[in-house]
Amino acid sequence: MNPLNPSSDGIKENLLTLLAQKAYRFGDFSLASGKKSSHYVNCKPVSLSGPGLLSISSLFLKQINESDSGVAGLTLGADPLVSGVVILAAQSGIDLNGLIVRKEAKGHGTGAWLEGPLPPKGSVITVLEDVVTTGGSSLKAVEQLRNQGYLVKQVLAIVDREEGGLDAISKADLELNSLFFLKEIVERANSLQ
């Protein structure tokens, strides 16, 4: 089997196990949203590993519309996701631009919010996200992209914690598509103990 073309179901199952083993923790945590939780998911140990990023990128690429000109996300969590999808797209003969959205405007030079090859205004960009809780990070990226004249219709996330992110993203006239819900990762982690 070609490692770039295994079945989506097999990729997803393997990725779920990786997330349960390397990204999920149980305890007392403060989330970026300010909420407290006993479940914590840090996708970076998976998205910054070769097998993890290849799996995520493959699954994301299958959900990107042919009319999209690029993918983007808020630094730092989306940096490997954007890079992985763009590389895999290029290997598949698909021309996608990768954009990184800064958390604040660059303090020197052009003062840019966006880094990367900027497609023409009006281009459709899909936002990539590691974990969606309230949707705040995704919406910050969407806001900056829309302010620059891009159309954003969809957010792709590795994990949806199901804590209001879907509602917030839907209210911004966006679709949220997640590879997993937090409960799936918790169930897999519990089954591996």
Curated annotation (Swiss-Prot):
The keyword Cytoplasm does not apply. Keywords: Glycosyltransferase, Magnesium, Pyrimidine biosynthesis, Transferase. GO terms for molecular function: magnesium ion binding; orotate phosphoribosyltransferase activity. Its cofactor is Mg(2+). One of its GO terms (biological process) is 'de novo' UMP biosynthetic process. Orotate binds at T133, R161. Pathway: Pyrimidine metabolism; UMP biosynthesis via de novo pathway; UMP from orotate: step 1/2. It catalyses: orotidine 5'-phosphate + diphosphate = orotate + 5-phospho-alpha-D-ribose 1-diphosphate. Its EC number is 2.4.2.10. Catalyzes the transfer of a ribosyl phosphate group from 5-phosphoribose 1-diphosphate to orotate, leading to the formation of orotidine monophosphate (OMP). Homodimer. PANTHER family: OROTATE PHOSPHORIBOSYLTRANSFERASE (PTHR19278), URIDINE 5'-MONOPHOSPHATE SYNTHASE (PTHR19278:SF9). HAMAP family: PyrE. This is Orotate phosphoribosyltransferase. The lineage of its organism: Bacteria, Bacillati, Cyanobacteriota, Cyanophyceae, Synechococcales. The gene is pyrE.
